[in-house]
Design a protein with these regions (language model features):
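Active-site lid/adjacent beta-loop-alpha segment flanking the redox-cofactor pocket in flavoenzymes
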Residues: 135-238
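Mid-domain beta-loop-alpha active-site segment that forms a flexible
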Residues: 40-61, 105-107, 188-199, 245, ...
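Helical element adjacent to the flavin cofactor pocket in flavoenzyme catalytic cores
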Residues: 41-99, 107
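Dinucleotide-binding Rossmann-like beta1-alpha1 core, especially the glycine-rich loop
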Residues: 1-28, 150-153
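A short, glycine/Asx- and small/polar-enriched loop/turn
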Residues: 2, 29-37, 79-86, 222-226, ...
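Central helical "cap/lid" subdomain
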Residues: 93-142, 158
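Short loop/edge segments at beta-strand edges and connector loops
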Residues: 21, 71-73, 214
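C-terminal lid/capping helical subdomain adjacent to the catalytic/cofactor pocket in oxidative enzymes
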Residues: 19, 24, 234-307
Length: 307
């Protein structure tokens, strides 16, 4: 039933999907064991991208439209006069502007707070691993998600990339480190990573024979209601949020950009875009203890069927 609901959402979005037999799935991923699968939902257009390649594609297109980029130029402060954004201060200059978009990831909380906005943007730890190269792992193998095991996997060239959503998430409190500092260093948690491999074992027996090559980790930000924080703040004219992306910052970036533009340029944005406004937290009382717990819950149940 849950997969049928997923298919209905995909159909509504115009994505081609179909249920396929286990044998057909086995043919697409020969190293995997689909014998116990009760349903396999196939999306031919699914895939993945490299964040750096996507970023450079955005940059190239933006430059063609007249945008300018100042790389290696940190913004030190946002200038505000009489409730309006008037510019930003960099290491070398002051740039006058009427609009600032806060798209700073794990530091989105700090940038918002610097202009007087308190928003529940919670960094939550996420890890994945890449194995050594192995026979049978080819770059064109499909991306696989196993909701019951809260795992995702794909080929990384001729290696295996596997990550998952921890059942007991670890978050950081952004109030504990300043804007000028990096978020806390994450050491690889081999107990968690080993749990991913153990969960994957029945579906991909070969995983237990593959050596570990590298571990990747970071702090994607989550919100207490599991929705983006997008759009202008009524408390400060010209300050626009694009944060709290709930681990969709890269994959959802084009849609997030479209929502940001709609929130800024449309007289009457859609109900959905209005529902993402940062004002929803200003209007409703919240506290950090509850916000962290709720944000972690959305991380922990990221793949939960029936959630």
């Amino acid at each position: 039933r849950e997969f049928e609901q997923m298919k209905a959402v995909a159909d509504e979005a115009g994505l081609e999907t179909e249920f396929i037999e286990n044998a057909a799935a086995q043919a697409k991923w020969p190293l995997m064991n689909f014998a116990a699968a009760k349903a396999v939902l196939w999306c031919p257009s699914d895939g993945y991208l490299q964040p750096s390649d996507l970023t450079m594609a955005y940059v190239a297109h933006a430059r063609r439209r007249g945008a300018k980029f100042l790389t290696g130029t940190p913004v030190r402060s946002i200038h505000v006069e009489k409730g309006h954004v008037t510019g930003v201060e960099t290491d070398t200059d002051t740039i006058a502007c009427k609009t600032v978009v806060n798209a700073t990831g794990a530091h989105a909380f700090h940038v918002a707070r610097s202009v007087g906005l308190e928003l529940p943007i919670v960094p939550v730890r996420h890890e994945f691993f890449v194995t050594v190269h192995a026979d049978g792992l080819e770059p064109d193998l499909p991306v696989v998600r196993i909701p019951d095991a809260t795992l995702y996997l794909r080929a990384e060239t001729n290696a295996l990339l596997c990550g998952g959503w921890e059942p007991k998430a670890l978050s950081s409190d952004p109030r504990d480190y300043p804007l000028a500092d990096e978020p806390p260093l994450i050491e690889p948690d081999y107990e968690v990573l080993g749990g991913f491999a153990e969960q994957l074992g029945p579906h991909l027996p070969k995983v237990n024979q593959l050596g570990l090559r590298s571990v990747f980790r970071g702090w994607p930000t989550f919100t207490p209601d599991g929705r983006f924080i997008i759009g202008p703040s009524s408390q400060l004219s010209g300050f626009v949020m694009a944060g709290g992306c709930n681990a969709h910052g890269v994959s959802g970036s084009a849609g997030i950009g479209r929502h940001v533009v709609e929130s800024m340029s449309e007289d009457t944005p859609s109900d959905y875009v209005r529902s993402l406004s940062p004002d929803r937290f200003a209007a409703n009382g919240w506290n950090w203890e509850t916000a962290r717990r709720d944000a972690q819950h959305y991380y922990e149940t990221y793949y939960c069927l029936g959630h």
